[in-house]
């Protein structure tokens, strides 16, 4: 999982990426290709 300051590029890397808020943190998750997971500080 990458930790990024901005998720703008992370959410457009793959068509199945989706932005989710969990416990006050913003995540990009990808069910089909978990390589593209990312988190914002």
From Swiss-Prot:
One Pfam family matching this protein: Ribosomal_L36
InterPro entries xref list: Ribosomal_bL36, Ribosomal_bL36_sp, Ribosomal_L36_bact
Key words of the record: Ribonucleoprotein, Ribosomal protein
GO CC term (a single one): ribosome
Any one GO molecular function term: structural constituent of ribosome
Membrane-crossing residue ranges in chain numbering: none
One annotated GO biological process: translation
Family statement: Belongs to the bacterial ribosomal protein bL36 family.
Protein name: Large ribosomal subunit protein bL36
Species annotation: Hydrogenovibrio crunogenus (strain DSM 25203 / XCL-2)
Gene expressing this chain: rpmJ
